[in-house]
C-alpha cells in the first residue's frame, strides 16, 4: 500500500460467505470492507470454509483491495466482572485471531469492554492478561 492510496468501503454481511462479501464490495465500487467475525451479539462463529476463503483471497488480490477490518462481536467483554463473560471473550478473541490467519495482513477491531464497577486498573489488567494469553 502506498501512503497516497485511499481505500473506501463499508460494513458487509458475511452471511452468504467470504467470497460473497468480496463480490458485494466490488458491486458497490469498494476497495476494502469490514465484517463481523460472528453474530455481532455473540455466539459461535460459523465453520470456516477454506475454499471460500481462498476464493476471497484471489478476488482481493486480483482487484487490489486494501486491508480488511474484521470486527469482533459487541458482547465481547474482556474485563467483565463475570468470569463466564470473560471466558466467552477470550474464546472469541482466540478463535477470531486464528480465523484471521487465513487473511493475513488485515485488521481486527474489538471493543475491550466495560469494567462494570471493578475500576479501570482491574479492567486494564484483565484486558492485558487476556491479550497476552490469546496472542
Which residues does each predicted region cover?
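Active-site acidic/histidine proton-transfer and metal-coordination neighborhood
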Residues: 78-135
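N-terminal pre-domain/capping segments
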Residues: 1-72, 76, 80-95
Amino acid at each position: 500500500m502506498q501512503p497516497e492510496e485511499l481505500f473506501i468501503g463499508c460494513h458487509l454481511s458475511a452471511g452468504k460467505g467470504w467470497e460473497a462479501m468480496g463480490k458485494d464490495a466490488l458491486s458497490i465500487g469498494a476497495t476494502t470492507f469490514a465484517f463481523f467475525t460472528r453474530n455481532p451479539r455473540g455466539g459461535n462463529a460459523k465453520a470456516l470454509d477454506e475454499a471460500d476463503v481462498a476464493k476471497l483471497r484471489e478476488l482481493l488480490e486480483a482487484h487490489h483491495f486494501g486491508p480488511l477490518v474484521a470486527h469482533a462481536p459487541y458482547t465481547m467483554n474482556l474485563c467483565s466482572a463475570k468470569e463466564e463473560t470473560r471466558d466467552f471473550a477470550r474464546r472469541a478473541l482466540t478463535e477470531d485471531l486464528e480465523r484471521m490467519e487465513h487473511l493475513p495482513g488485515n485488521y481486527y477491531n474489538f471493543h475491550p469492554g466495560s469494567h462494570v464497577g471493578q475500576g479501570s486498573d482491574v479492567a486494564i489488567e484483565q484486558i492485558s492478561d487476556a491479550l497476552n494469553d490469546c496472542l
